[in-house]
Structures are given as C-alpha cells and as structure tokens.
C-alpha cells in the first residue's frame, strides 16, 4: 500500500512543531543557565593580585576599558559614582585596561582621576579572552554573589537599569 499525499499532510506541520518546541526549550534553558565568571586573577596597577577567591560572595563589576576609548573615558565618572554609591553595601569593582593600552597611560589616568576602585592591567590579553574574547570597549560585566554573570553591557550601560540590578543583587 502506498501513502497518498493527504495521509502525509500532517508530517510537515508536526515536524515543524517539534522543531519549534525544541528550539524554544533550548533558548529557555540557555537564557536561564547563567555562565560562571571566569576563574582569572587580575593584577592591579599597584602589583596587587585580585583573585577569584577574594571576590567570592560579593557582587562585582568588571569593566574592560582603554584610555584611548572616548566612551570609556566618558562613562568613567558615572562608574566612579556607581561604585561610591554601592561600595558600602559590598560592591567590588575592577577596571581592566585592555592589552593594547600602555601601562603608563593607565597608571597616569587612574592616579590623576583618583579612581577609587581597583584598576588592573591585562598586558597579555588573557582576561579579555577568558571573558569571551572581549574586543569592544567598554564592556562591563556584573557578577552576582554566586559567581554567575548577571549581565554583560557592550558600550555604556543604562545606568538607572544597572543601579536597579545592583540594588537587587546586593540585597539578595
């Protein structure tokens, strides 16, 4: 017995429904399974090691930036204000200068602006690689107390939304 065209008519819609449901499930689980922050140790401009262990249990902002990046320089006062607003609640902040940024420029910038948070040099580019091959600056990560990445901002963050996220994370 051969199948007639009408008896196979249900196969394509059923297959499409199964594929759509599968794609939806994958999207749901991937969006709800946050990635862990990389286990990388930063080295500050003062030679201090900033280890993953020292950041555990804290809400952390990791900001990849460069002194040659106008958006980075423009957002830095707002980053300072954000840090100052939430540091008493336990916010940690690491500003990571990109590998192409001359260390003396970074040190000069941090000292003349009196940046109140840790400033690290990514001389080898390993930190940028570990955080998903960061190439665009600024790129900012918000990491929860559980060590999971809560949000990644490309470009200057929406600061009111960032502040809401920080408040929620610092309370939790």
Each language-model region and where it sits:
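Thiol/disulfide oxidoreductase modules built on the thioredoxin-like
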Residues: 108-116, 123-167
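Active-site acidic short loop of glycosyltransferases
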Residues: 56-58, 88, 116
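Short active-site neighborhood of thiol/selenol oxidoreductases, capturing the structured segment around
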Residues: 51-70
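Short loop/turn microsegments at loop-to-beta-strand junctions
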Residues: 37-38, 60, 137-138
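Structural microenvironment flanking redox-active thiols in thiol-disulfide oxidoreductases
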Residues: 73-113, 123-130
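C-type cytochrome heme c attachment motif
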Residues: 67-74, 136
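N-terminal targeting signals for export/organelle localization
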Residues: 1-43, 172
């Amino acid at each position: 017995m051969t199948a007639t065209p009408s008896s196979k008519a249900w196969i394509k819609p059923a297959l499409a429904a199964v594929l759509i449901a599968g794609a939806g499930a994958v999207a749901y689980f991937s969006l709800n399974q946050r990635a862990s922050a990389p286990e990388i140790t930063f080295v500050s401009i003062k030679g201090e090691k900033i280890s993953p262990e020292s950041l555990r249990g804290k809400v952390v902002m990791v900001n990849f930036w460069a002194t040659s990046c106008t958006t980075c320089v423009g957002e830095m006062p707002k980053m300072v204000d954000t840090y100052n607003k939430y540091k008493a609640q336990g916010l940690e902040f690491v500003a990571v200068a990109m590998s192409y940024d001359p260390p003396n420029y970074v040190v000069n910038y941090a000292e003349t602006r009196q940046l109140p948070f840790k400033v690290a040099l990514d001389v080898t580019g390993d930190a940028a690689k570990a955080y998903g091959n960061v190439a665009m600056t600024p790129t900012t990560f918000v990491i929860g107390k559980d060590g999971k990445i809560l949000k990644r901002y490309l470009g200057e963050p929406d600061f009111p939304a960032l502040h809401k996220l920080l408040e929620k994370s610092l309370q939790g």
